Amino acid sequence: MIVENIPDEFKKALPILEKIREAGFEAYFVGGSVRDTLLGLPIHDVDIASSAYPEEIKQIFSKTVDTGVEHGTVMVLDHGTGYEITTFRTESTYQDYRRPDKVEFVRSLEEDLKRRDLTINALAMDDKGKIIDLFDGLKDLKNGIIRAVGNPEERFHEDALRMMRAVRFGSQLDFKVELDTFNAIKKNSHLLEKIAIERIHVEWVKLLLGKNPKQGLQEFLDTELYKYCPLFADKYAELKSILEFSDFKLNTEEECWTLLSDVFKLKDTDISNLLRSWKSSNNIIKYVIAASLCVQKIKDSKLDIETYYQNGIEIILTANQIAKIRGFGMDDNELKNNYDKLPIKSRKEMKINGKDLVQEAGVKPGKIMGEILNKLEKEIVFGNIINDKEILIENAKKLLEEKV
């Protein structure tokens, strides 16, 4: 097969391939960028594989960066763009189901492609657009099939994360995991415990954000991978209930965790425990806790001015996306209009600050000043006083007399 219209991202890298070939070595585009080109999807990173060893690549190009020489990877800098070139390699035994004991550089493209995870990712393309397909990856792309390269158990023993990648690609591409690969995942699902949570986290979120998350989630459950993910082992029924939602589209990681928190019926501390076990950032945790409270307020028709002001429109819309999936969402435009009606969106928009209170209202720095600012802020938000400096100073003086 020949790719007639090679994407610009590849065209820009063609001089790299040509220079390697002129030096007497093979070089091909490989991996996800080739797969996505064949699927008509936008491509991101352009990866190159070559028969040249790292030291040979460094002799061919004047500007290189050692990004992973021990694994055969060198970055070539070309007109401000970096291209990672990885030497064809084979990998020996895997003691821990995630890292090879030994990486051996080879001159054979076939040997390199044999060690890749899935047939759809084991495709290469030369500088003329010709596709090298040694494992029927093109057929699987056409038929929407996720299949391990060669013996699936061997692939999953090499890196157990590949099991999560398989079901993630099922969601991302709306493909189905073929039977032998599926059975190998189910048989070896316990090996997922060997993998760092951070790596599983990435695949899990990509699964939920995929084109057909129900497909990926169904296979995630059926293969029993869920049993070996943090705090999911006893959540089969809750996870399965997500499959029953008719409108199931998530757009951000925050939406993913907010939906799960709602389905699991978690409160603040439980949400924090779940997300910490998945190694989420503190910012994500705070965001999801806030959004989860807003989901409940939407459900109870208790979205008030204070909720809009304290959370901001982004968190409100995240909550509403989950509310819509759950069947009780509001119109986004109505929410935006309500938010836009707020007199101020944050304390920074107040026409006075602590310095003004000191100089013009005689307020001394300290607890009283904080209380006065809080009171004035709340009065502005609720529309009880206008956000005008003179008016605010007068109100500050009154509050000072009353000691707030």
UniProtKB/Swiss-Prot annotation:
Record-listed CTP binding positions: G32, R35, R116, D159, R162, R165, R168
One GO-annotated biological process of the protein: RNA repair
Protein residues bound to Mg(2+): D45, D47
Cofactor requirement: Mg(2+)
EC class of the enzyme, as a word: transferase
UniProt-recorded Gene Ontology molecular function terms: ATP binding; CCA tRNA nucleotidyltransferase activity; magnesium ion binding; tRNA binding
Entry keyword set: ATP-binding, Magnesium, Metal-binding, Nucleotide-binding, Nucleotidyltransferase, RNA repair, RNA-binding, Transferase, tRNA processing
Protein origin, superkingdom: Bacteria
Record-annotated membrane-spanning stretches: none
Binding residues annotated for ATP, in chain numbering: G32, R35, R116, D159, R162, R165, R168
This enzyme's EC code(s): 2.7.7.72
Catalyses which reaction(s): a tRNA precursor + 2 CTP + ATP = a tRNA with a 3' CCA end + 3 diphosphate; a tRNA with a 3' CCA end + 2 CTP + ATP = a tRNA with a 3' CCACCA end + 3 diphosphate
Self-association and partners: Homodimer.
Task of the protein: Catalyzes the addition and repair of the essential 3'-terminal CCA sequence in tRNAs without using a nucleic acid template. Adds these three nucleotides in the order of C, C, and A to the tRNA nucleotide-73, using CTP and ATP as substrates and producing inorganic pyrophosphate. tRNA 3'-terminal CCA addition is required both for tRNA processing and repair. Also involved in tRNA surveillance by mediating tandem CCA addition to generate a CCACCA at the 3' terminus of unstable tRNAs. While stable tRNAs receive only 3'-terminal CCA, unstable tRNAs are marked with CCACCA and rapidly degraded.
Other remarks in the entry: A single active site specifically recognizes both ATP and CTP and is responsible for their addition.
Family: Belongs to the tRNA nucleotidyltransferase/poly(A) polymerase family. Bacterial CCA-adding enzyme type 3 subfamily.
Protein name: CCA-adding enzyme
Species assigned in the record: Ligilactobacillus salivarius (strain UCC118) (Lactobacillus salivarius)
